[in-house]
């Protein structure tokens, strides 16, 4: 079905005007971003195809421009628009979080990262950087890929922590299997991070492993 065959009230732009932005599905939001379809496919068809490729919306923030272009109907112009929209959303989210969020317990931190990490198909190592009042001052994904001691080097983590004048950090990574039970490599990485933190004077408050709607705090479990 092409856009001109869609009921006027059901077109994304008209739907937004009539019912508000909250009434739009994720695919319809993507359709608004990419704006046009092709000669043979509507913009909504292409938007739905994008959402089928990225099973969870959080995956889009880690996709490269080449990955978006693998979707039939998406060229460099449309891929660039999607990436710009995703990046804008990330920056708005970070500014909001940094002004408002204080981490008092592992659950507070998990609420920040669970939506992003729980449904990814690759392991992502993510850090939250805090000030002396345990307020979030910055957060960033540091590594992508299998977590092991040769990849996750404390130097990279604490270089950024020092640059942000952090008093402490919390580290997270996801298990794509959904099971947050720690591996021997997870424990080795945690030990090295805690030791490096003691040397530079920046405390590793916790290393939390994210599974499917569940997590394990290595600090609470007494692993370090």
Curated annotation (Swiss-Prot):
One of its GO terms (molecular function) is metal ion binding. Keywords: Hydrolase, Metal-binding, Metalloprotease, Protease, Zinc. Belongs to the UPF0758 family. It comes from Listeria innocua serovar 6a (strain ATCC BAA-680 / CLIP 11262). One of its GO terms (biological process) is proteolysis. Residues 102-224 form the MPN domain. InterPro entries: MPN, RadC_JAB, RuvA_2-like, UPF0758, UPF0758_CS, UPF0758_N. A motif (JAMM motif) lies at residues 173-186. Zn(2+) binds at residues 173, 175, 186. The lineage of its organism: Bacteria, Bacillati, Bacillota, Bacilli, Bacillales. This is UPF0758 protein lin1584.
